[in-house]
Amino acid sequence: MIQEVPPSPPDARIEQDFQRDVWCLFGLPVDNLTLEGTKHLLRERVKLPYNTVLSTINVNWVVQSFADPAFRAAIINSDIVTLDGKPLLWLAKLLGYPMTETVAGSTLIQELHQDKTTDTKLSIFLFGGEDDAAAQAAKEINKNPGGLYAVGSLNPGFGTVEEMSSDVIIKTINQTRPDILLVALGAKKGTQWIERNRGRLEAKIISHLGATINFLAGKVQRAPLIVRRIGMEWAWRILQEPKLFPRYATDGLILLRVLVSRFLLWRKYLYLMTKTRNIPVDTSVSSCEGEQELRFSFGKNLRLTKDSSFPKLFLAFATSRKTITLSFKQTEFVDGAIAGLLLLLKKHQLKNKNSINYTQVHDKLNQIFTLLGFSK
């Protein structure tokens, strides 16, 4: 068993983070959630005294995260991250991850609105979009009563993130006290705006779902279900909006180049995963605690799928408020779930302005981290 680490009183948000079933994909923490599970989770989160940031990532988000550390950090700092698009789901399955379906933001909002059986309707504020799309989307939502009702909309026009973060804009949103704040400012600008203002916003769920406003407003027709099921929604979007073709082509080529460069690492990962599958999971940990630092040495085979006590250990790390030094001298294999926990730990160490160090990481383990996109 893992050696107990005396934790500090856990912050509720940190404790909640380490209860996630999260996996590292291209260096991003992706939650293993179904559409129904996500709907239920959001309905529970609106009851909490603090807000929740939801990110639904597609190929474009992944590609942008390669080159933009701030954008990557914004995704990592989200409280829920789901896969929006079949290509990412297929790639997750190639790594042996347990995800079974995508959770696209537009589908999620549509499903929440079409749920007319719920006793508790959720209020939604629409922020951004082109021209009058947000106002039109609000009208369409209220014209067809369901699980959502619109309490306001605002198009801030063109401007910087700072200009869109004025007291007047934040007050306009907050006075409606929405359960859901749907943001559509472009992926990078939208996530930056959320990162900057989440502490000032009184919305319970905050999410950048760019195209969703256009779908709700009826300005763009969503792909038929069969097209979405076979992973061809991107082709439908191009037919609807030809201006998207350059972006889709560029994103596809960049992702393909990354996949080709990591093909051999993927083969080695599958080999190591098979080779160590029947080896007992050694979760023994040796630790040394100082006044300002905690040092931990992990065992040989780190698999969350075979030992569910890891999240409790990582929670203790995150709530220690100390510098954390992790030694991987004996470690031969780390699964995507452990890498996901490492992402969360790094996030909270940075938020708490504490350091995290990784020592004695040998070549095989470095190759696994490179494949999964985990940056030390």
Write out the residue ranges for each language-model feature.
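Portal/gating segments that form or line small-molecule/metal binding sites
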Residues: 75-140, 144
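Short beta-strand/loop segment at the start of cytosolic alpha/beta domains
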Residues: 268-297
